[in-house]
Amino acid sequence: MSVADVKKGVEQKMQRSIEAFKNDLAKIRTGRAHTGLLDHVQVDYYGSMVPISQVANLTLVDARTIGVQPWEKNMVAKVEKAIREADLGLNPATTGDLIRVPMPALTEERRRELTKVVKSEGETAKVAIRNLRRDANEALKKLVKDKEISEDDERRASDDVQKLTDKHVAEIDKLVQTKEAEIMTV
């Protein structure tokens, strides 16, 4: 293993942490409708659980309503049930074969709770990034101990790892701020 391998590995892992954090943020409901909110809803399709996007077309009817059009008429009730049981606080209404999912307006108290959740998720993501930094620095120290690199090389590499850490932590902060602003916008 070389310094380049360590740096490349830690950068890939940090990027995956950021992607996981973005997915977590997408699950947090804001006042506005977006189809990504239903991405994690699983529907019982002839005995197997599949993502809602594989059995229905998701569209935005307006700023506060998602339209869900199942491809098979017999799936309407199952899709509606899956949305209702997804623990998103949504109450779908069916008209014919179109399921309308209105987004209830968020109360001020609920908005504040959601911003706390976003901050907490952000802190968790930062801890994950810092843990990756620690692992990379330990790998670099092991390379020095095994006499594969000099201490100067290790110092330079750990500075590079720190720069990567700072960059990814700043990205998390930016994502948190954006999501908080989205939640607090009435």
UniProtKB/Swiss-Prot annotation:
This is Ribosome-recycling factor. The gene is frr. GO terms for biological process: cytoplasmic translational termination. Keywords: Cytoplasm, Protein biosynthesis. One of its GO terms (molecular function) is ribosomal large subunit binding. It comes from the Bacteria. It is found in: Cytoplasm. The lineage of its organism: Bacteria, Pseudomonadati, Pseudomonadota, Betaproteobacteria, Burkholderiales. Responsible for the release of ribosomes from messenger RNA at the termination of protein biosynthesis. May increase the efficiency of translation by recycling ribosomes from one round of translation to another. One of its GO terms (cellular component) is cytosol. Belongs to the RRF family. NCBIfam families: frr. It comes from Burkholderia cenocepacia (strain HI2424). Its main location: cytoplasm.
